[in-house]
Amino acid sequence: MVNVHEKQSTETITKIRNEVGLDATLGYQHCDMTDLIQVQEVFSALRDELPRLDLCIFGSGIDQAHFTTDLHCIDAYFGMMWLGHFYASNLLWPLLRRTSKIPNAPAPRVVFEASGQQSLQSSFDGSSSDEEILRRSAYNAEVCSEIFCRSKTSLILGVRHGLADRIVKRHHDNIYALAVQPSRSLADAGGQSRRDSRWQFSDLCDHVLDTLAKDPYFAVRSSSRIVLYAATSLDVEKKYLNGAYLVDIVSLSFRLCFCTYC
């Protein structure tokens, strides 16, 4: 487990050991995914130390609900969800390739979690007027929405066109790369409401996300827990879901569409 929060990680490891047995082999490594120097050091060491890597799930930043910048003075969404995750995956790729060549071993999987739209909760002091609170809330929500859309679009398209198309297929790797969005409602998987009648740059990102989420040839919609589905389902190999964007939608009926490529 690689995490910037030590307490959270140790508590999780303790809980897992209590459930599956104290002899469970678990470990924790500190790393700030927005610090690319740390990412290089930590994941290069893991690449050299681990004998194999069958599954890697990247989920940093999915619960971030406010705008902030990282050590490189770029928004932390982009730093974690795009730069940090993809840099780490590139560092681990030689290990994934070695694992894929082990006789009778299943194809390794790399899963990138893309967050649903964050709900922004702003706190204001008692001296702020109602009008000021509304104005600042609208501004903060706008900033949060734009950085979310930009980073999420980068992650989804990066998995499909960056990893699946340009690396896996080009080098004939027996490795699967998937992007998933754990959602709580249909609204999370659908489009964002337009803020006004004027065209804005963020509308382009909104439109791309809308299209990806609704395209039956690109998105897999499942009522199951989508991360677990991406990590364990036999459909990933049977339907060759490499580069797919999997969306967890709460619905009464189970619907499964699989992506195909020319």
Residues of each region from the PLM?
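Rossmann-fold NAD(P)H-dependent dehydrogenase/reductase core
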Residues: 1-191
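Residue-level detector of solvent-exposed, low-hydrophobicity positions
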Residues: 30, 65, 93, 155, ...
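Short, solvent-exposed polar/charged micro-motifs at secondary-structure junctions
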Residues: 37-41, 253-259
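Short, surface-exposed, charged/polar-biased interaction segments
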Residues: 77, 131, 198-201, 251
